[in-house]
Structure formats: C-alpha cells, structure tokens
A protein has these predicted regions:
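Active-site catalytic motif of lipid deacylating hydrolases and related acyltransferases
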Residues: 1-39
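Catalytic histidine neighborhood in serine/cysteine hydrolases
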Residues: 11-13, 122-138
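Active-site nucleophile loop of the alpha/beta-hydrolase fold
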Residues: 17-20, 66-75
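Catalytic histidine-centered segment of alpha/beta-hydrolase-like enzymes
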Residues: 23, 135-148
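Conserved alpha/beta-hydrolase fold motif
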Residues: 43-44, 104
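Gly/Ala-rich beta-loop-alpha elbow adjacent to hydrolase catalytic centers
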Residues: 44-54
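Short beta-strand/loop motif that positions the catalytic acidic residue
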Residues: 98-99, 103-106, 110
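Conserved alpha/beta-hydrolase "acid-adjacent" motif
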Residues: 111-117
C-alpha cells in the first residue's frame, strides 16, 4: 500500500510510533507534530492510530484522514482506557471542520472492535464509510486497493492536486 500511495504523489511516512504497544495519546499526538503533519497531510490510522488521527484533527488542520478499525469508546479495556484517547468527549464538529474529507473502513467480522463503534463514528462525522464483511481487524498486511482508490478520488477533488 505504501508504494501505491507514493504513486499518487504522496510523500509517505510509514514509521513505527514510539510507545507502540501502549499507544498513549500523550506520546503519539506530539509525535504526529514531530513528523510534520500540516494542512497538506493525509493521516491514515489503523486501530489506535485511527484514534490518534481523530484526536489530532480535533485541534489541527489536515487535508484528510482515513480511519481503519476505528472506535469511540475504550471498549471496557483497561489498556485502552489508560491510552488517554477516551477521557474527554469527542469533538466531532472540530474533527470534521479541520479537514476536507474523512473515510472510514471497518469490517463486520472485526474481532477487536464491534462494527457498531465504527458506524457511530461515521454517523457523527458524516463521512465516507466502507463496511467489509471479511477483513477482520485489517491485520492481514494484504494490499488495500479500496483505501488507495478512496485517497485517489479525494485528492482528485482537491484544487491544485
């Protein structure tokens, strides 16, 4: 997927984040800043990365984001609760206002995040939502042509792209 996104003219930063097991907001959100995210950035976040993309967009302008395996609650999990993403209410209007577009990909057979979570996020963001039935938690590392096509379509709608 990285190569496919680069072929769209994107400078792809695919880096393991610090604290990648606990995925704490207090570490990840400043790291997104360190990577140089700005109004021309497309954030693509999977699982905890999707939560980070949401929280980042509450207070920062980005071009757009793609959220894969997203949720809005800690799912009753102590580790998720400790991550810091779920302490404050979600500022859906700010997330939406701070970017031109948002796409969500989820699978109804995700063993970690119930599909109702992603549907809830999509309903609050009034964004593009794509629901699969057989992708689990999208951890198979296979190509993801649907995501690449979505980004391609969105970039084509941005003036000057």
């Amino acid at each position: 997927m990285e190569r496919d996104l680069a072929a769209l003219g994107l400078a792809v930063v695919n880096q393991t984040f610090p604290d990648n097991v606990r995925a704490r907001a207090a570490i990840w959100l400043p790291f997104i800043d360190e990577l140089g995210a700005d109004e021309q950035t497309v954030l693509i976040g999977h699982s905890s990365g999707a939560q980070a993309a949401l929280r980042y967009a509450e207070t920062h302008r980005v071009l757009g984001s793609v959220l894969v395996g997203v949720c809005h609650t800690d799912l009753g999990d102590r580790g998720e609760r400790a991550s810091g993403y779920y302490r404050d209410p979600w500022r859906w209007d700010d997330i939406r206002r701070n970017q031109q577009w948002i796409g969500i990909f989820h699978s109804s057979d995700d063993p970690l995040i119930p599909v109702a979570e992603a549907r809830h996020v999509a309903s609050h963001l009034a964004c593009s939502y794509y629901e699969h039935t057989d992708r689990g938690h999208f951890t198979d590392r296979a190509a993801f042509p649907e995501l690449v096509q979505f980004v391609r379509r969105q970039l084509a709608r941005v003036p000057g792209s």
